[in-house]
Amino acid sequence: MSRKMTGIVKTFDCKSGKGLITPSDGRKDVQVHISACRQHETEALIPGIRVEFCRINGLRGPTAANVYLS
């Protein structure tokens, strides 16, 4: 089950396409992969940017899906 949330990009590595988002509700950081972003927003994942996303339970813990700038 997914839950729509907002948060701030904490880290993002362009080479690996992976990073972390800190949810606004104070929950544990959520993993993000470049493939979870809308195509035209993939270059905008820089630390400090506010995003909206759906939180899903991935194989390695909380994961972001359907990520876009808020």
Curated annotation (Swiss-Prot):
It comes from Salmonella typhimurium (strain LT2 / SGSC1412 / ATCC 700720). SUPFAM superfamilies: Nucleic acid-binding proteins (SSF50249). GO terms for cellular component: cytosol. PANTHER family: COLD SHOCK DOMAIN CONTAINING PROTEINS (PTHR11544). This is Cold shock-like protein CspH. Its main location: cytoplasm. Keywords: Activator, Cytoplasm, DNA-binding, Transcription, Transcription regulation. It comes from the Bacteria.
